[in-house]
Amino acid sequence: MDQEQEFLQSLSGLRDQLLDVLKDYWIFSIPYSLGEVAIAGALAKSFKQQYGGPLAFLVDPAKMGVAQLFADQVDVAVPVPMHLLRNLNRRGFLSPETFRRGSVQDAYEIHGAKLNFVSLVTLRNQHPDRGLPVTDVFRFAMRLPWEAPLHPGRPDKEALEQAERIAASVGMEPGNSVILFPGNNTNLPAPSVFWKRVAKEAAAAGKRVFVNVSGAALLPDDLDVPGIPVELNDIPQAIALCEIAGRIVAGSNGFLMTALLTETRFGLDVILTDAFDPTASGRHYQPMPIRSGSLFLQAPEIKEDIDRPYREWEVPSSVDTESIAVDLVRAWSAGNGSPS
């Protein structure tokens, strides 16, 4: 038996094991990033209202924290490495046409049915009046009506208590602090000069400034951004700590989508850039329409439901980013930061 055959045999064994353990569950495989797990989690209640339970999610171990935010609706979350989940689909081990308990469904792309839903999302990003937003792609894959509502998740008591301990240990002023997230995962991070100016202006405005650099694959060249360092690796704790701080500034990514789909109210300033690296290595950047990073394009219903200070800022590579940083901080005192 060659290596390929051994791998296929292991995938078959994994599928059979999952189906045996979860034979009475609706099972959704979500082999993607934080935001995708959060969207599926936010639709879990609507799914169970439509089809009943119990409901199981298969997610990468690093994304289990997102599933925990929706523990009141997702009955069990099973950690399975992302590459195995993706190969279960790509190698034809899933049966998307069999929609019932005890059959694994992919909550986003159904390669086995020769459908690539990401193409619909790409069209949406390029032309906002065309294609489907990410949230509707999930509704379609989960066989929900277009009007199925998103239900926010929440950090549990343990995460809230741990966040309070962290906040006290680093001297965070509740409601008067800002956490900067200079890094990103696929979208190009804004340059360090932008982040330094945001930190400077925020401090001058009386904010306690914190800088998180953990959990990001892509970082600006110079990370000497003034601020108190914090490491936010646990997703529920990180969201709870952001709520204590009162505001964050970050590039468009799955963490922000996750945060928007929780019962929190901290302010969000989202940085949109004009390139991305699908390999997340920092060596293969490709240009992209700057608005494609807009969370409102990906989940337009959140613009109607949002109840927090929120702004999106376009920071293209060819402009004076320091002036944008100044405007960003000044906007905090200009109003409540209604969606833009």
What is each PLM-predicted segment?
Residues N116-P189:
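Mid-sequence helix-capping/hinge segment at a functional interface
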Residues I27-F28, A56-F57, L180, V211, ...:
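Structural beta-sheet core signal
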Residues V37-Q50, N185-N212, W313:
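Conserved catalytic-core segment of nucleotide-activated headgroup transferases in glycan assembly
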Residues V80-R101, N125, P155-L160, L218, ...:
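A short acidic, often aromatic-flanked loop/helix-cap motif at beta-alpha or helix-coil junctions
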Residues D2-D129, Q237-R247, F255-T258:
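Active-site and donor-binding regions of nucleotide-sugar-utilizing enzymes
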Residues L260-S340:
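Nucleotide-sugar donor-binding patch of glycosyltransferase catalytic domains
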Residues G65, A190-F276:
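Donor-binding and catalytic core of enzymes assembling or modifying cell-surface/extracellular glycoconjugates
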Residues F70-V80, L219-L232, H284-A299, D307-W313:
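Active-site regions of enzymes building and remodeling cell-envelope glycoconjugates
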